[in-house]
Amino acid sequence: QVYEQIKKTLSDDPHVYVAKYKGDRACAISYTFDDGLAEHSTVAAPELEKRGFRGTFWVCGYYTEQGASAKVPRMTWDELREMSKKGHEVSSHSWAHKNAKRLTIEQVKSEIEKNDSAIYANIGIVPRTYCYPYNYKTEEIVSMASKGRVATRTKQISIGGKSTPERFDKWLKDLMKAEDWGVGMTHGINYGYDAFKSPSLFWEHLDKVKSMEDQIW
């Protein structure tokens, strides 16, 4: 919306135009990772860093405080703090990943505020984005969750167990054509929900995106 407002303001000047993305690139991609799995720190983040990329890692404080002892091992606050120092975004996925469909609006608010407080207390940053558990949202929830934030995740494409080279290539082609901002949603890498059949598919995709960094922000 801000982009469109600025574009409209400058539209009368033929010598000036507003680039939609940094470097006037054709499209943009954000890679986001849900639920704070331990391998996001040991596998996903290092693979992104190899290519000069950074990701958004949505965490639930309830899971994080269980760490390696959880049924599905999770990142610790120490690991998340180090990732944040390296430039990754650590942000909120609610406190305990409860389905907002079964909660009152006050309970949803409590889940959000408790997790924001935990992230700030343990990492020293205030989350400026938000990811909805189970991707469930209503206009009221979006309005509430958006207060004090630059964005919440309202659209995404699943990157995981159903990913193929063909699907990755089509996604890139569609983003380029539409000049769109794509948001990837990944859960498991080697284990957990929607884990890859072969993680190498993802790394090869990242290599391709790296080779196109003059076109993709």
What is the meaning of each model-derived region?
Residues L37-A38, A96:
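Short, glycine/acidic-enriched loop or turn micro-motifs at the edges of active sites
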